[in-house]
Amino acid sequence: MTEIEQAYRITESITRTAARNFYYGIRLLPREKRAALSAVYALGRRIDDVADGELAPETKITELDAIRKSLDNIDDSSDPVLVALADAARRFPVPIAMFAELIDGARMEIDWTGCRDFDELIVYCRRGAGTIGKLCLSIFGPVSTATSRYAEQLGIALQQTNILRDVREDFLNGRIYLPRDELDRLGVRLRLDDTGALDDPDGRLAALLRFSADRAADWYSLGLRLIPHLDRRSAACCAAMSGIYRRQLALIRASPAVVYDRRISLSGLKKAQVAAAALASSVTCGPAHGPLPADLGSHPSH
């Protein structure tokens, strides 16, 4: 096994283990694109893990600076994740410099004190999942002004879904991502009741979450304009990944209280069903690039 093959084996293992939602879409891609996207995901995950980890803030900043510097000499690296990413960038137009935006988003996470309004939240989302969307597009293709905008918008929609899904978990970790002006306008103050669930005696939090979920749905409408521009297998991947998050968003829109005491998730079977439906609906979108995956019926346990 070559160094590059071993590197991809590692990044694909990281993706299979950690990408509990994205993996269902990624596995619909042909082998070369699947491997490249696993390399992008693995480095994105490393950056995110630094920001979300237990290290002291100054240590996190040092770690992120080290990652940023490592990208300057990526072709000479022996780090398996960077070896795989460098190879992916030789096969596809992956903009390595764009990972700096992802690191900037992680720096925002370290210094997070909340956001003043939705515009400020969008800056955060754009540097995070919006950047991931554009990195994925570099592998899906084709890259244009329009498709880059759609990919960014779709990433922003996914991150808004995460914020609503994880509102309690984030609050327990001392973080609030809901815009302050919207919290103030509706008179919402996040707190826990005696059972440890988010307290909402007057339904104001539910009203804010439903409003936010409706807005996120609008961002999906913008971002999903990307799909007709993609080849069949890339379209299926994109539709599967976004479809899983849209299912979660639909649960929140229907009953915001569902996130008051837990972090909602779809079962592995439901995620596999979403992926299968995405693949089936992509049949009329154009020619596939490569044979269909033989393992469609299998899915990770998470």
Curated annotation (Swiss-Prot):
PROSITE patterns: SQUALEN_PHYTOEN_SYN_1, SQUALEN_PHYTOEN_SYN_2. GO terms for biological process: carotenoid biosynthetic process. Involved in the biosynthesis of carotenoids. Catalyzes the condensation of two molecules of geranylgeranyl diphosphate (GGPP) to give prephytoene diphosphate (PPPP) and the subsequent rearrangement of the cyclopropylcarbinyl intermediate to yield phytoene. This is Phytoene synthase. Pathway: Carotenoid biosynthesis; phytoene biosynthesis. NCBIfam families: HpnD (TIGR03465). Its EC number is 2.5.1.-. Keywords: Carotenoid biosynthesis, Magnesium, Manganese, Metal-binding, Transferase.
